[in-house]
């Protein structure tokens, strides 16, 4: 294992986003090879796109799932959010189920070892919506976040980036090496942006 400095990273996600799902898979891998703690934070792509009439959210709304995640964190903590997010991702991206379906959320809760009744409780509690939006707009204000995955170092108080956008997900030491390089880059005061035009160069 690398002797890298311990880090706490705030990982902002929307459970409807496949890129955030892959990055979450990666950051879980990083935890196995680097001294990293992950704080799971909420970001609403629906809120970002609410004025865009070209976006059809009917089959892919994530607001109910985010509200359930907020109540789960309040009652059971960060580790339970991790488990539920993983279960929701399995439903959405492995089994191609819609997170707007109440039964899908309840099954994910059960798979995460949580009470399926938390879905109805979260949607009956208006403060869960407030909590999601408060967290969403806090990172928008802090670093002008616009999408997910968004990573912010120092438990959400330090420098941040949009990304990484990765496919396939690196494993083992390769995951750790990507983390090392990203953290180094994020902590460079002059760094602003980097973007790859395509996965592989044309020959």
Residue locations for each model-derived region?
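Basic, Lys/Arg-rich alpha-helical nucleic-acid-recognition elements, primarily the DNA-binding modules
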Residues: 1-4, 19
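Extreme N-terminal starter segment of soluble prokaryotic enzymes
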Residues: 4-10
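Residues at structural and domain junctions
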Residues: 13, 54-55, 91, 118, ...
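Structural alpha/beta surface segment adjacent to cysteine/selenocysteine redox centers
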Residues: 15, 21-105, 181-185, 193-203
